[in-house]
Amino acid sequence: MTDSNLDIWLTIPTGTRRQYLADIIKESQISPEKIVIVHTVESEPIEGVNNIWDLDPVNIHRWWNRGIDVARTFGADYIAVLNDDVVLKNNPINKIAYGMNKLKATLGYPLPYAGHIPGYCWVLDIKSNIRADETFRWWYGDDDIRLKAKELGEVVYIPAEVEHLHGNHLTSTNEDLMKLTIADKEYFDKKWNL
């Protein structure tokens, strides 16, 4: 299974955790010219991929949209959105995208749904025209996308090997990110009448 039939892209926002990027890029099995790295701090470009710098205040949803918008501009079918601290095994991005295509799904992810989608890895059908709501700054935007996707079609779990190395570590150790998370939760609940 390769990305030769479907036009599958990948975007990764990254700050200071660049040590995993080379392995993610290699193991994604996505052509480097279809990879968008969104740098959130001053940093050197990653050779061979599309590099974008977004040094404005923290907003992971804006960072996701930067990659989504590039892929959409080039006519992509699907885009995978990954954190910069994942380990990929056995071609998970293509596996999810091809599974979504077969099931006519709008959104796919690699783990069973447990109240939240795994924000560290999800794949979006670009033709859905869904973008992340940039009112969210740090959390809940992935669940917002899930609810938007459910309004348009199927949201599916496709078993795939994606390991998240530092789950919620940044948030739990950063008071500012915790405040953003609380504000995002309040907005999410209000937006979806929860």
Predicted regions span which residues?
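C-terminal catalytic/acceptor-binding lobe
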Residues: 137-139, 143-194
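Cell-envelope/extracellular polymer assembly enzymes that use nucleotide-activated donors
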Residues: 7-9, 144
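Acidic donor-binding segment of Leloir-type glycosyltransferases
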Residues: 26-55
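Glycine-rich, basic loop-to-helix element that forms the pyrophosphate-binding segment
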Residues: 55-71
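A recurrent flexible, glycine/aromatic-enriched loop bordering the glycosyltransferase active site
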Residues: 108-124, 131, 137-138, 176
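Short beta-strand-to-loop acidic/aromatic patch adjacent to the donor-nucleotide binding site
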Residues: 76-87
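Conserved donor NDP-sugar-binding/catalytic core segment of glycosyltransferases
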Residues: 86-116
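Short, well-formed alpha-helical segments that are part of the catalytic scaffolds
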Residues: 16-30
